[in-house]
UniProtKB/Swiss-Prot annotation:
Consists of a catalytic RNA component and at least 4-5 protein subunits. One of its GO terms (biological process) is tRNA 5'-leader removal. Its cofactor is Zn(2+). Part of ribonuclease P, a protein complex that generates mature tRNA molecules by cleaving their 5'-ends. This is Ribonuclease P protein component 4. Gene3D superfamilies: 6.20.50.20, Immunoglobulin FC, subunit C. Keywords: Cytoplasm, Endonuclease, Hydrolase, Metal-binding, Nuclease, tRNA processing, Zinc. It is found in: Cytoplasm. It comes from Methanococcus vannielii (strain ATCC 35089 / DSM 1224 / JCM 13029 / OCM 148 / SB). InterPro entries: RNP4, Rpr2/Snm1/Rpp21. Belongs to the eukaryotic/archaeal RNase P protein component 4 family.
Length: 109
């Protein structure tokens, strides 16, 4: 049983490294105006996370549009606003599909 656990931990570490590499590639390709290749890299990284049954890393989760699957670079293909109408939150709008994300801001004590 210990051997299986070690194998799973090792494979999850490899999967995390590959996800990071693919997401960095997606970021570079989007800056070079290659949107389709960037979407393919995002899709591949999501498939790796699903196959390994692990959650997608939080640092990358908010950089992907949940509607169209494109990688978001703030100011280039997405806009970011801070609103405080009913509650304080960050509004991220994907400029490709016009999908809106709201991320609540926790108040510090």
């Amino acid at each position: 049983m210990k051997l299986k656990k070690k194998f799973l931990e090792k494979s999850k570490n490899i999967a995390n490294e590959r996800i990071d590499i693919l997401m960095n590639f997606a970021q570079k390709e989007l800056r070079c105006e290659k949107k389709e290749r960037s979407k393919n890299y995002v899709l591949l990284s999501k498939k790796i996370a699903m196959r390994m049954r692990m959650p997608f890393p939080k640092e990358w989760r908010r950089r992907i549009c949940k509607n169209c699957g494109s990688f978001l670079i703030y100011g280039k293909n997405s806009s970011v606003r801070i609103k405080s109408k009913n509650y304080s939150h960050v509004v991220i709008t994907c400029l490709e599909c016009k999908h809106i994300f709201r991320i609540p801001i926790k108040k510090s004590k």
